Curated annotation (Swiss-Prot):
One of its GO terms (biological process) is positive regulation of gene expression via chromosomal CpG island demethylation. It comes from Mus musculus. It comes from the Eukaryota. This is C->U-editing enzyme APOBEC-2. Residues 64-169 form the CMP/dCMP-type deaminase domain. The gene is Apobec2. Residues 1-23 are annotated as: Disordered. The keyword Zinc applies.
Length: 224
């Protein structure tokens, strides 16, 4: 299953880039690691089509999908009822902070207590235990923040630590959902680059509904 393959990737110290750090005695492998560009968080408004089709696909076996893509919508509402909305996406590159943590470091590094924040994430996979802990800490000290997380896949969902982290998110008021086919279509329309002069319709992959139901059942079992 997907969680087993992702678990193997996450076991390495540089978990997000999938490199096998146990082979550092290999000169070629060492050179490859040294030549990696420095860690950075990629941000933008719309992500390339091929990134969406590969990274967001809700497959059960997620080999090779060792990055996190996070599309976000932030609605900020004043006491007078006026609201402003911004949106974009984050992609984590190589080792370092994951996209969830980077969101709070770069997109919303501070919160105005006089405003209300409604944040929606569309994420390629559910948070790891460490990212869930960061989310919990932010929610606990930011009472004017409401967070909805929609995920394509569940990351390492059989691990007790991850299950406990997801339960704590629910208990803290964070809403966690598996993406429905309609959610993928929403991402396609609002966060994916379109060819200039034309807007192609979203084409669901063959097992999109089946895999949604699979992950929805797993998440319900975890959160019950």
């Amino acid at each position: 299953m997907a969680q087993k393959e992702e678990a193997a990737e996450a076991a390495a110290p540089a978990s997000q880039n999938g490199d096998d750090l146990e082979n550092l005695e290999d000169p070629e492998k060492l050179k490859e690691l040294i030549d990696l560009p420095p860690f950075e968080i990629v941000t933008g408004v719309r992500l390339p089509v091929n990134f969406f089709k590969f990274q967001f696909r809700n497959v059960e076996y997620s080999s090779g999908r060792n990055k996190t893509f996070l599309c976000y919508v932030v609605e900020v509402q004043s006491k007078g009822g006026q609201a402003q909305a911004t949106q974009g996406y984050l992609e984590d590159e190589h080792a370092g902070a994951h996209a969830e943590e980077a969101f709070f470091n770069t997109i919303l590094p501070a919160f105005d207590p006089a405003l209300k924040y409604n944040v929606t994430w569309y994420v390629s996979s559910s948070p790891c235990a460490a990212c869930a802990d960061r989310i919990l800490k932010t929610l606990s000290k930011t009472k004017n923040l409401r967070l909805l997380i929609l995920v394509s896949r569940l990351f390492m969902w059989e691990e007790p630590e991850v299950q406990a982290a997801l339960k704590k998110l629910k208990e803290a008021g964070c809403k966690l959902r598996i993406m429905k086919p309609q959610d993928f279509e929403y991402i396609w329309q609002n966060f994916v680059e379109q060819e200039e002069g034309e807007s192609k319709a979203f084409e669901p992959w063959e097992d999109i509904q089946e895999n949604f139901l699979y992950y929805e059942e797993k998440l319900a079992d975890i959160l019950k």
